């Protein structure tokens, strides 16, 4: 590799913590949130984000069908779109087309304004839902970034810029990891394991989400249960249980149960439980159009629900994943990042994405809360999430998939 080429690092971190809560009788929609429903900017890019989410999911699923998957399409797409502001030529086109944008159908200004509004909306204070994102730009002291790039990533992507001494890789690593740890409230530590000596800049994106269930589980109803990883493997997990009314339907197209559980605030978790032997069919068949139908047509029924407590982590080298989606130039010696800086040729050395998911019934917010529901006299069906299933965390105002994943083994 020519010594004149310096390296950049793309680091993306996501944390999704699903905690209990209570029914909020006084939850009112603010004027600001009403405006969001009518604001077209982030809605323009929402279908592309959903398409990208499923594209990325399928690439990861093909890499391994025996491991958990968890990632934030919003985090990955935001960082790449921000980086695209400093790219030119094929490098530029590959990134935006890899994010499922058709540049003949959508103006580039609309794309960046869409992300700008998305980030503004997601970061709006909400006392019911903790949701924050951050973009950090770590720049070597010897490197001067182009003024336009710096201005654009600050204005459109709310980026913070930090001066970093990359010649001291341990100190640089500590600075970057500290930024991520603080942004994810201590949940993601040591996001960067190693830094190459040629690294001169790092673009770091994090997303932190902590949601409280509208209808929490009771801790005393959690008991040990079986989770069937595959035909040959069964593991013991803490299985939460609640008898009540849930948004649940059976989809014959997907051969799956579809459960929607709302958070206090403006987000929903969608869990898809395929029939035995139908996981591959579900992965191949699910689309953004089918997902949209579920969100619009909800069916409430009484169910005895069993759901595993879990904490899973997804860590990915995005270089191999993104190359499958056609994003290759930015990682090669042919990369054109001249919009970032003209001082030295740059390429992206690697892209790292780490996301953590925790689902439980705990939390002081749920203490002393009682939710009473009318239950019919006939015995309701049991629905047990005791085999591999998919999860999508969806934010309603922006119509965005915040997180996507697959739980194969809750104990991993």
Swiss-Prot record:
Organism superkingdom: Eukaryota
Where in the sequence does glycosylation occur per the annotation?
65, 102, 165, 266
Q: Which residues carry this modification: Phosphoserine?
A: 33, 378
Coiled-coil spans are none
Keywords from UniProt, A to Z, are: Acute phase, Glycoprotein, Phosphoprotein, Protease inhibitor, Secreted, Serine protease inhibitor, Signal
Pfam families linked: Serpin
GO CC, any one term:
extracellular space
Disulfide bridge map = none
Chief place of localization: secreted
Q: Where is this site: Reactive bond?
A: 377-378
Where in or outside the cell is it found? Secreted
SMART domains of this UniProt entry?
SERPIN
**Where does the signal sequence lie?**
1-24
A GO BP term, please?
acute-phase response
**InterPro entries assigned:** Serpin_CS, Serpin_dom, Serpin_fam, Serpin_sf, Serpin_sf_1, Serpin_sf_2
- Tissue and organ distribution: Plasma.
Q: Name one GO molecular function term.
A: serine-type endopeptidase inhibitor activity
Q: Segment RCL: which positions?
A: 368-387
Regarding protein family, the annotation reads: Belongs to the serpin family.
Self-association state and partner proteins as the record states: Interacts with CELA2A. Interacts with ERGIC3 and LMAN1/ERGIC53. Interacts with PRSS1/Trypsin.
Task: Relay the domain remarks.
Answer: The reactive center loop (RCL) extends out from the body of the protein and directs binding to the target protease. The protease cleaves the serpin at the reactive site within the RCL, establishing a covalent linkage between the carboxyl group of the serpin reactive site and the serine hydroxyl of the protease. The resulting inactive serpin-protease complex is highly stable.
Please give the function described in this protein's UniProt entry. Answer: Inhibitor of serine proteases.
Question: What is the name of the protein in this document?
Answer: Alpha-1-antiproteinase
Q: Which organism is it from?
A: Callosciurus caniceps (Gray-bellied squirrel)
């Amino acid at each position: 590799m020519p010594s004149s080429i310096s390296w950049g690092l793309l680091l993306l971190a996501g944390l999704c913590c699903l905690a209990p809560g209570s029914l909020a009788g006084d939850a009112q929609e603010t004027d600001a949130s009403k405006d969001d429903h009518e604001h077209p900017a982030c809605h323009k890019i929402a279908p592309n984000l959903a398409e990208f989410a499923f594209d990325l999911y399928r690439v990861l699923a093909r890499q391994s069908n025996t491991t958990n998957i968890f990632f934030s399409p919003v985090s990955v797409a935001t960082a790449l779109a921000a980086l695209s502001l400093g790219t030119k030529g094929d490098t530029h086109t590959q990134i935006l087309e890899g994010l499922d944008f058709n540049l003949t159908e959508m103006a580039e200004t609309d794309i960046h304004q869409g992300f700008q509004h998305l980030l503004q909306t997601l970061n709006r204070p909400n006392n019911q839902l903790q949701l924050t994102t951050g973009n950090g730009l770590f720049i070597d002291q010897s490197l001067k970034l182009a003024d336009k790039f710096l201005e654009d990533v600050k204005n459109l992507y709310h980026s913070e810029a930090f001066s970093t001494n990359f010649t001291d890789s341990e100190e640089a690593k500590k600075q970057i990891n500290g930024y991520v740890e603080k942004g994810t409230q201590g949940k993601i530590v040591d996001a960067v394991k190693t830094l190459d000596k040629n690294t001169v800049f790092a673009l770091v994106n994090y997303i932190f989400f902590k949601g409280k269930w509208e209808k929490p589980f009771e801790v005393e109803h959690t008991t040990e249960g079986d989770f069937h990883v595959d035909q040959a493997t069964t593991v013991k997990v803490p299985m939460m249980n609640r008898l009540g009314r849930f948004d649940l339907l059976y989809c014959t197209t997907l051969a799956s149960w579809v459960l929607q559980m709302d958070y206090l605030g403006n987000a929903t978790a969608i869990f898809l439980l395929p029939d035995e032997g139908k996981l591959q069919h579900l992965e191949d068949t699910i689309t953004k159009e089918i997902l949209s139908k579920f969100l619009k047509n909800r069916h409430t029924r009484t169910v005895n629900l069993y759901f595993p407590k879990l904490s899973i982590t997804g860590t990915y080298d995005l270089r191999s994943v993104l190359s499958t989606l056609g994003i290759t130039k930015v990682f090669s010696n042919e990369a054109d990042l001249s919009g970032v800086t003209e001082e030295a040729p740059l390429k992206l050395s690697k892209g790292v994405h780490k996301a953590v998911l925790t689902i439980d019934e705990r939390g002081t917010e749920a203490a002393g809360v009682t939710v009473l529901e009318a239950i019919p006299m006939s015995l309701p069906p049991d629905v047990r999430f005791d085999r591999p299933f998919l999860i999508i965390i969806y934010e309603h105002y922006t119509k965005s998939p915040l997180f996507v994943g697959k739980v194969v083994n809750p104990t991993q």
